């Protein structure tokens, strides 16, 4: 059995202040005996309109996170960072950036996932509408990170609404799905817990949903409720409190194998043509 931690934060626009919180959560996770900690979307800097400015620091921020993983000998799913270049090193010519989730081992970065599904929606909150595609270029590749405790399928926030991605990750060998997120208060209240459990049930993977919670400036409010669901789709734990919090949950690969053998969903799937 392995212990895995899921973080909840209220990140603001002060990178150094956020890093103090990040390190404290790593310390707490390590004290809990966890092998992995998952951070939420925008965990290093949460502010609209500064994507390019933060993206310019991508490599230095990555190095700082690698140093934390090495210092504390823990795996880190580094929420998301804005990045000015694609995985092949090419720069986006239109001024947009990529939303990148890194999986970092104590020895360094092991995988990079660029968020595929962008949040272009109308929400009945103070902000009203969101159009991530104005500022971000979507990724195209499905990514698995191999770890000593199982294969991690990397997802980000809005990706949770698309079961095809979770099922593709499962078909490529994922045991765990990570979903660093910053759900709006409105959409989170409606669907967050449901999505964690639904994607776990669909894929028979353990789902770890790290979350932003609270106010970020005067208009942006996030739902929080960082949580985890097991390979049956049952809720393992969810944070009900506000602000910075951490949960640590068990993951048993042997038990997951038994669940999948007893209900072999992937073998039973039939993609019908209508």
Where are these predicted regions, by residue range?
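Active-site-proximal beta-strand elements of phosphoester/diester hydrolases
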Residues: 1-13, 38, 112, 144, ...
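A short C-terminal boundary segment appended to hydrolase-like catalytic domains
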Residues: 254-274
């Amino acid at each position: 059995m392995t212990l895995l931690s899921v973080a909840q934060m209220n990140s603001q626009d002060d990178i150094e202040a956020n890093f103090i919180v990040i390190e404290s959560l790593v310390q707490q996770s390590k004290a809990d005996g966890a092998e992995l900690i998952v951070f939420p979307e925008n965990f290093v800097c949460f502010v609209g309109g500064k994507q390019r400015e933060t993206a310019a620091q991508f490599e230095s921020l990555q190095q700082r996170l690698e140093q934390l993983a090495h210092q504390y000998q823990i795996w880190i799913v580094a929420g998301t960072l804005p990045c000015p270049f694609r995985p092949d090193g090419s720069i986006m010519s239109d001024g947009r950036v990529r939303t990148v989730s890194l999986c970092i081992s104590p020895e360094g970065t092991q995988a990079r996932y660029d968020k595929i599904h962008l949040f272009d929606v109308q929400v009945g909150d103070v902000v009203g509408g969101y159009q991530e595609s104005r500022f971000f270029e979507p990724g195209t590749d499905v990514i698995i990170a191999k770890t000593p405790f199982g294969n991690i399928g990397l997802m980000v926030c809005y990706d949770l609404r698309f079961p095809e991605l979770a099922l593709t990750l499962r078909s490529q060998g994922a045991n765990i799905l990570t979903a660093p997120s910053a759900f709006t208060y409105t959409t989170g209240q409606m669907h967050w817990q449901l999505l964690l459990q639904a994607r776990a049930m669909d894929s028979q993977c353990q789902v770890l949903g790290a979350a932003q919670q609270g106010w970020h400036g005067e208009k942006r409010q996030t739902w929080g409720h960082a949580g985890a669901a097991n390979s049956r789709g049952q809720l393992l734990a969810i944070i009900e409190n506000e602000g910075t919090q951490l949960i640590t949950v068990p993951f048993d690969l042997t038990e997951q194998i038994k669940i999948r053998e007893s209900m072999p969903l992937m073998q039973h799937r039939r993609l019908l043509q209508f």
